[in-house]
Regions:
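Solvent-exposed coil/turn segments that connect beta secondary-structure elements
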Residues: 27, 39, 55-58, 66, ...
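Sec/Tat signal peptide C-region and signal peptidase I cleavage site
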Residues: 14-18
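Short, well-ordered beta-strand elements
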Residues: 19-21, 47-56, 99, 109-111, ...
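Gly/Pro-rich hinge or "lid" segments in bacterial periplasmic/extracellular proteins
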Residues: 79-89, 181-245
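N-terminal lobe/hinge region of extracytoplasmic solute-binding protein
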Residues: 19-106, 136, 205
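Sec-dependent N-terminal signal peptides
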Residues: 3-12
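Surface-exposed binding/hinge segments that line
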Residues: 113, 149-193, 209-216
Length: 249
């Protein structure tokens, strides 16, 4: 604990203690040692096929651009966010890619410390540079959906003091911004080296619970559960994503 406190103080003279979870306006419901969310079966069996009907077709696998009809599974199944929001609280977040996080006491920055076990589907570790690249691409690339730029518009800059630490500096106090940043979808910096426009039909390299298998453009897409998913035993993931195959058609 002493080492952790010294580490936090090294970033800023106005820092708060690292947290496993945060709630907006209230303490998080779940304790630090929770095993799984109450609404899931932590020992649920794995297997089977889950087919989901989709209204309309799709013409792109890139979920971040404004143009095109998006395929349904890429963002929800193959990409992890910094944190995970529980479904039985107004607005609370718990660790996923970020194992802990904190809002500075002055309210002008938020820091996320990455889980050292996190890795992308290509085997690369999830590093601070990937988080920074994801944020910058989504908020600065002209082809990106403007939602991202608006949603995080009070972020002045992002810093990466080391491979596992990401600091977001704010333009002004914003009561919800640190929570909104937890919803950042993180993908490898190798995903779109030439920007989103040239990668308009390219899916990101993610770290999520499923991997893309195949698709019939506009009609069907299929995903397989990653049996080596790095986060499968985290409390925010235990008992979830149980089907071996998920199919949209």
């Amino acid at each position: 604990m002493k080492t952790l406190v010294l580490l936090l103080l090294s970033f800023s003279t106005a820092t708060a203690f690292a947290a496993y979870g945060l709630g907006l306006g209230q303490a998080p419901k779940y304790p630090a040692d929770f095993r799984a969310y109450e609404y899931v079966n932590p020992d649920a069996p794995k297997g089977g096929v889950f087919s989901l009907p989709i209204q309309g077709g799709f013409d792109t696998f890139n979920p971040f651009t404004l143009k095109g009809d998006k395929e349904a599974g890429v963002l929800t199944l193959t990409v992890d966010m910094l944190t995970d929001n529980s479904w039985d609280e107004p607005f609370s977040m718990y660790g996923l890619l970020a194992e802990d996080f904190w809002l500075a006491e002055d309210g002008l920055s938020a820091t996320f410390r990455l889980n050292p076990k996190a890795k992308f589907h290509n085997g690369d570790p999830v590093l601070a540079k990937d988080v920074a690249a994801s944020f910058r691409l989504l908020t600065q690339d002209k082809a990106a959906n403007p939602f991202y730029r608006i949603y995080w518009s009070d972020v002045a800059k992002v810093e990466t003091p080391d491979d596992r630490t990401v600091v977001f500096r704010f333009k002004q106090r914003n009561a919800e911004l640190h929570m909104a940043l937890g919803q950042l979808p993180v993908f490898s910096h190798k995903s779109y080296p030439e920007g989103l426009e040239k990668g308009a039909n390219k899916m990101p390299i993610g770290s999520g619970p499923y991997r893309f298998v195949k698709a019939d453009i506009g009609r069907m897409s299929e995903y397989a559960r990653d049996k080596n998913y790095w986060a499968q035993n985290l409390p925010t993931r235990r008992g979830r994503y149980n089907f071996d195959t998920v199919r949209f058609k």
